[in-house]
A protein has these predicted regions:
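Active-site nucleophile elbow and catalytic-triad environment of alpha/beta-hydrolase enzymes
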Residues: 40-61
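Flexible "cap/lid" loop of the alpha/beta hydrolase fold
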Residues: 1-22, 27, 49, 78, ...
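Second-shell loop/turn segments in exported
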Residues: 26-31, 72
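Conserved strand-to-loop "acid loop" that flanks and positions the catalytic carboxylate
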Residues: 66-75
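Active-site-adjacent alpha-helix of alpha/beta-hydrolase-fold enzymes
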Residues: 80-93
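Short, proline-enriched alpha-helix->beta-strand connector loops that line the catalytic pocket
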Residues: 62-67, 89-92
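PEST-like low-complexity, intrinsically disordered acidic/proline/serine-rich tracts
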Residues: 21, 32-36
């Protein structure tokens, strides 16, 4: 969870997993969802293996495959400036959507449109032109 400074809202479990502090969930990732939905998602979140954040990538698919990225401009979990930088670095086609971290839930039509554009652009060929 990145913002101006790293968030302390990620809580570790004794067995190596992390989850978002339920009292901070809505403010961190779900400000644009109805409160009842944010509360439900907070209560039903599944912990993630902390090791997943340290696992090295062995292949950078963006080097030879078309890449598309969505910057959630109101994201409180992943700083939008960092998201833009990563997407630009990879040569991704960037779409900005005014939404928080759970953009695929709060703005499903906009996200689907980006996916459809990406699918049409490769036309069955998912390799970048050389």
């Amino acid at each position: 969870m990145l913002g101006e400074v790293p968030s302390s809202d990620l809580k570790p479990t004794k067995d190596g997993f992390i989850f978002i502090d339920p009292t901070k969930f809505a403010a961190d990732v779900a400000t644009d969802l109805p409160p009842a939905q944010a509360e439900y998602m907070s209560n039903s979140q599944m912990p993630v293996a902390a090791a997943a954040f340290d696992a090295p990538a062995t292949v950078a698919a963006w080097r030879d495959k078309p890449s598309y990225g969505i910057v959630a401009t109101a994201d409180h979990a992943l700083n939008p400036m960092l998201a833009r930088w990563m997407y630009k670095r990879s040569g991704a086609e960037i779409t900005e959507i005014k939404a928080n971290h759970l953009v695929y839930i709060s703005q499903p039509g906009a996200v689907a449109s980006v996916i459809e554009t990406a699918a049409r652009s490769v036309g069955g060929n998912a390799t970048k032109a050389q």
